[in-house]
Amino acid sequence: MVYFNNEEIIIRDMIFSDGLHFTDEERKQGWDSTIDKFEMRLKDVKNGKCISLVADYYGIPAGYVNVYPDSEWGAFANQGYPEIIDFAVLEKYRKNGIGSILMDTAEKIASEYADTVYLGVGLHNGYGSAQRMYVKRGYIPDGSGVWYKDKICTPYDTIYTN
């Protein structure tokens, strides 16, 4: 399905080849990307759990985002609030309005399910552009702290990630 289309950007449903493309491109920019994440999202799409969107920029997949209408994790798990998660625009395509249009589309989809939406936000500096965009769009932290593997992190504990 196509959700948005102007002369340069198309927002559409994700397909398997997008996962291969993004895995390759993210590795080229130094990210630890695997196809597993995209396969999981597409499985969730097939099971009716999420909507996975891709932004094509002049016909090339340049970014993606996922909307879970009733997310099963995080501070608002299973409360009927949609979550926007795993948002990315490849570095070489940033500053072209792709991220804003992706988020506009994701928010519009989320609004069909509830008046409140929440975000899954990465905390390392690689997500800095997205973090700044979320603030500009008016998102406010919920105050529950940092979550890892579906649990709130305990103050002063050491957390090891991949």
What do these predicted ranges mean?
Residues A77-E91, L119-G120:
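Conserved acetyl-CoA binding element of GNAT-fold acetyltransferases
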Residues S100, L123-T161:
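Conserved active-site alpha-helix within GNAT-family acetyltransferase domains
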Residues N6-F22:
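A short beta-loop-alpha structural element at the N-terminal edge
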Residues V54, I60-S71, E83-A88:
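Conserved beta-strand in the GNAT
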Residues A110-L123:
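Conserved GNAT acetyl-CoA-binding A-motif
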